[in-house]
Swiss-Prot record:
Species per Swiss-Prot/TrEMBL record: Mycoplasmoides pirum (Mycoplasma pirum)
Quaternary structure annotation from Swiss-Prot or TrEMBL: Homodimer.
GO biological process, one term: glycerol catabolic process
GO cellular component term of the entry, any: cytosol
Record keywords, A-Z: Cytoplasm, Gluconeogenesis, Glycolysis, Isomerase
Metabolic or biological pathway: Carbohydrate biosynthesis; gluconeogenesis; Carbohydrate degradation; glycolysis; D-glyceraldehyde 3-phosphate from glycerone phosphate: step 1/1
Protein name stated in the entry: Triosephosphate isomerase
Catalytic reaction equation(s): D-glyceraldehyde 3-phosphate = dihydroxyacetone phosphate
Location of the protein in the cell: Cytoplasm
EC number: 5.3.1.1
Pfam families xref list: TIM
Chain sites annotated for binding substrate: 9, 11
Amino acid sequence: MKKRIIIGNWKTNKTQKEVKEFFKILNASLKNKNICCTFGVAPVAIHLELAKSLAPKQMIIAAQDANYISSGAFTGTISWSQLKDIKIKYVIVGHSERRMYYNETDDIVNKKVKNLLENKMIPILCIGGNIEEFNNKKTYQVCATQLKKA
């Protein structure tokens, strides 16, 4: 059977206080429970270390994105090497919002996937079309292309 992993993407939500409250409630609700699946969250980058410190040990803390270049003049991005340094193993790549708002192409997604794999990290690949592609019944074709190019 394939391993299933459930990751909640927090996008640009939650303050430090809200992160602490989330994990307080989560940890209390998981007490003495047998968890039958692998699960995690992808908080905004500034909360990664806080989330790691508060999360139950079996929980995955993932990054929402990573630059495929390890360092340099890339204001506002976080590099795979910075994530690896704080022991973040999972990284979301190819999210529709990154494709739409930051013009990330299939080629950029491919570079990110390859770079993460080369550095023994795990990409969480997002594929999917937009509403126009859905209405034109091109979702399958778009997903197949994105998957192939990644």
